């Protein structure tokens, strides 16, 4: 899996101060998507053990208290990304149990397959649904369009 961008300190993509990883690869091709450069699975750089350890280290860093990890993209729940992200979120929950995990996906919760659903026990907040430009509303919190739903599983 590739990722396009990593922000070790982010206050935009979820509650509190967070680490945010924008993964590469999305097949939804939403009209008006703000991150079209993330659609290609080959965009960005390889998410390797070094990057994974960096995120764990940042989450544990007591100099800047982070509430959790955000996964966006691209689409973190695309099956090609789940292969890499499932063991990663398992590790985050194991090594940083006090941190929450937020995930943005174009898939709807009721559309997820078995592989994608395997991620759910490790996700605290899931924002689902494709971005629909005709339903775009800049006043929405954590969502780009009115069809998207915020699912709070744990918090």
Swiss-Prot record:
It catalyses: glycyl-[protein] + reduced [flavodoxin] + S-adenosyl-L-methionine = glycin-2-yl radical-[protein] + semiquinone [flavodoxin] + 5'-deoxyadenosine + L-methionine + H(+). Its main location: cytoplasm. GO terms for cellular component: cytoplasm. InterPro entries: Aldolase_TIM (IPR013785), NrdG (IPR012837), Organic_radical-activating (IPR034457), Radical_activat_CS (IPR001989), rSAM (IPR007197). It is found in: Cytoplasm. Its cofactor is [4Fe-4S] cluster. Its EC number is 1.97.1.-. The keyword Iron-sulfur applies. The keyword Membrane does not apply. Activation of anaerobic ribonucleoside-triphosphate reductase under anaerobic conditions by generation of an organic free radical, using S-adenosylmethionine and reduced flavodoxin as cosubstrates to produce 5'-deoxy-adenosine. Belongs to the organic radical-activating enzymes family. This is Anaerobic ribonucleoside-triphosphate reductase-activating protein. It comes from Haemophilus influenzae (strain ATCC 51907 / DSM 11121 / KW20 / Rd).
